[in-house]
């Protein structure tokens, strides 16, 4: 069994020994030039609409994961404004963490019912084998990012009625927010 990629196509050969060629082409409509303010307004409106779509008409208790960073703070702010009830927010980190500090500032400003989950380095490392089993990955970056999410999800499931959990994931990928993206070529 193998997969081989060619220019504009790929070939699959599976156990049946049949070869299938798939050709993919993309066409993009030319968009009119807009002012920077129009682009920013479009991002703002679509961002709010994406959160609204997940919050409006939601019958279940909502909570937000709040790191204190820009992405989760913006999402939490929108959820808080759209929600009919005071929302819960949760943060997780090591004692003295900057994330916990800034998450508390945002939570206080928004008036959320905020919970800080403070973990030790030992607890973090102890849980890695369990997380690897659950996420079915040994990828270092994935595991590192998943341990905190796993622990905060476990805490919420045991200590909260929240059934819908919203976070800021995806914004960095969409907007090129990771530090290593700054070294990427301009064409990205």
Per-range role (PLM):
Residues 26-188:
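ATP-dependent adenylate-handling active sites, centered on carboxylate activation for C-N bond formation
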Residues 1-34:
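N-terminal segments that mediate ammonia production and transfer
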């Amino acid at each position: 069994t193998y997969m081989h990629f060619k220019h504009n196509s790929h070939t699959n050969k599976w156990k049946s020994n049949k070869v299938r060629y798939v050709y993919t082409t993309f066409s993009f409509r030319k968009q009119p030039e807009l002012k920077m303010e129009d682009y920013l307004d479009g991002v703002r409106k679509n961002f709010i609409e994406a959160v609204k779509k997940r919050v409006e008409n939601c019958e279940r208790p909502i909570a937000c994961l709040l790191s204190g960073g820009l992405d989760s703070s913006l999402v939490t702010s929108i959820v808080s404004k759209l929600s009919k009830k005071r929302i819960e927010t949760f943060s997780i980190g090591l004692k003295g963490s900057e994330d916990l500090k800034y998450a508390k500032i945002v939570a206080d400003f928004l008036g959320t019912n905020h919970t800080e989950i403070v973990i030790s380095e030992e607890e973090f490392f102890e849980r890695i084998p369990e997380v690897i089993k659950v996420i079915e990955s040994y990828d270092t970056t994935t595991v590192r990012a998943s341990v905190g999410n796993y622990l905060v999800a476990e805490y919420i499931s045991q200590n909260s009625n929240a059934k819908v959990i919203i976070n800021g994931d995806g914004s960095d990928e969409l907007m090129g927010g990771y530090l290593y993206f700054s070294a990427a070529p301009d064409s990205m």
